[in-house]
Amino acid sequence: MILLEKFNSGQKIKQSGGYFAFIPNKINDIWKWESSDVNFLLEKANLELGELNSYADLIPNVDVYIKMHIRTEANKSSRIEGTKTSIEEDMSDIEDISPEKRNDYIEVHNYINALNLGIYKITSGELPISSRLVKEIHSVLLRGVRGENKYPGEYRISQNWIGGSMPSNAKHVPPPHFMLDELMSDLEKFMHKDDLKIPHLLNVRRKTI
């Protein structure tokens, strides 16, 4: 059993290369908390989700709205990787895109296709949120673009880091690659617990790994 108020998210452990990597503690357990603030926030989140569902029911053709939202999200998220296409260009045929922007166009459309694939697999019941689904989506993201030779559909096979020129001076060093299967398995089991009551932890854990 884990008491939320005393939960230690993990620790920095020295690796063979001399740098320190952050190793998250496992979370697939029974969670308890003493603060009433958590219950209040959960109730507020559930209420707002209910309002969102009600709003969706009022839209005559919600699928069109969702498709536009996915396209906008794909465009904005892809800019992190340096793509420079506009929403208008993303809605055009590839033949109408200037040659210097076609790679960016393909990256955005890969993002759209990956999101649609994930939504379909989950809503159709074909696959739950799982490592297998994450890998399938990843393979679509890297299809025919920069990074397509970097093991699409697989977890990373080497150490990465955020900020700095190497792990030793980085702002954040995630767990080493050989721990990913174990950590993702723990996250997957946690996501599918019947008594899960703190879903906001999922996104935090995903970004940590």
What are these regions (language model features)?
Residues 1-209:
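FIC/Doc superfamily catalytic core
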